[in-house]
Amino acid sequence: MPATVASMNVAFRQPSMTRDQFLDWAEAQERRYEFDGFQPVAMTGGSSNHSTTCQNIWSALRTRLRGSGCKVLGPDAGVATVGDAVRYPDALVTCAKYPGTAKLIPGVVAVFEVLSPTSGRADRIDKLREYRAVPSIRRYVVLEHRSAGLVVFWRPDGTADWTATALTAEEALDMPELGIVVPVQEFYEDVDFSGA
């Protein structure tokens, strides 16, 4: 539980650990955690559809990025966001060079999150706010979990305002900053929405 400091009838959360302390602590845990800048937050497990969608994202991006100097990484790759927060998105793309032992990935250009029944608010509001604050991130893609479709938040350069665009299964995700286009349906190959 984080320490609380009361001042003028307002409670302020004090960090229970620093980002570096969290990164060291998280390595020794059996469960996966993110860090909200104040305390560790347990990450929930996903469904078969969630796993399949993530694999499809990695495959689609890796195939298209091969030889470009950019690469896609999965949910073990951390992103430093606002304050001391650390997020582990379902997929990210970076074109930066960094050591293989890096705990936080620099130069992240695109971030992908697959929604789950419990992550909607965090993915659409909290993480969007955090990812928008990272200058290198140009695209944040939130994929639906009940049907094939996504919302992409993007900015044409590191300083412009963000724009949101919803895409259906029949459309394609254009990522000019990476020089690639991916049909939305490709992210949902072998995903069974019956019962979703």
Residue ranges and their predicted role:
Residues M1-A196:
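Gly/Pro/Ser/Thr-rich low-complexity, intrinsically disordered segments predominantly at protein N-termini
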